[in-house]
Amino acid sequence: MYKQQYFISGKVQGVGFRFFTEQIANNMKLKGFVKNLNDGRVEIVAFFNTKEQMKKFEKLLNGNKYSNIKNIEKIVLDENYPFQFNDFKIYY
């Protein structure tokens, strides 16, 4: 399993980016979450079954037509990442 954390910056809050991300993740049957951060970025934690699934998701992170992605910071999470997820959700 591949566990990734992403910090997305740019015009990503107030434009439906979390909903867009949730739809993609649920269509791909991913587990994890997406949430707004106080500094204007969006955080995503996602668990992938295959590297191909991860690459496909990352290609779709360009956002919807209302967002404007400036930067994507990607962090590989340790296999011992302490949280488990049953689905993919928006955290508020």
Swiss-Prot record:
Reaction(s) catalysed (UniProt annotation): an acyl phosphate + H2O = a carboxylate + phosphate + H(+)
Cross-referenced InterPro entries: Acylphosphatase, Acylphosphatase-like_dom, Acylphosphatase-like_dom_sf, Acylphosphatase_CS
Entry-linked PROSITE patterns: ACYLPHOSPHATASE_1, ACYLPHOSPHATASE_3
Keyword Hydrolase tagged: yes
GO MF annotations, alphabetized: acylphosphatase activity
EC number: 3.6.1.7
Pfam families linked to this entry: Acylphosphatase (PF00708)
Keywords: Hydrolase, Plasmid
Active site: 18, 36
Keyword Hydrolase found: yes
Superkingdom field: Bacteria
Acylphosphatase-like domain ranges (all copies): 3-92
The family this protein is said to belong to: Belongs to the acylphosphatase family.
PANTHER family membership: ACYLPHOSPHATASE
Protein's name in the database: Acylphosphatase
Organism: Borreliella burgdorferi (strain ATCC 35210 / DSM 4680 / CIP 102532 / B31)
Protein's gene: acyP
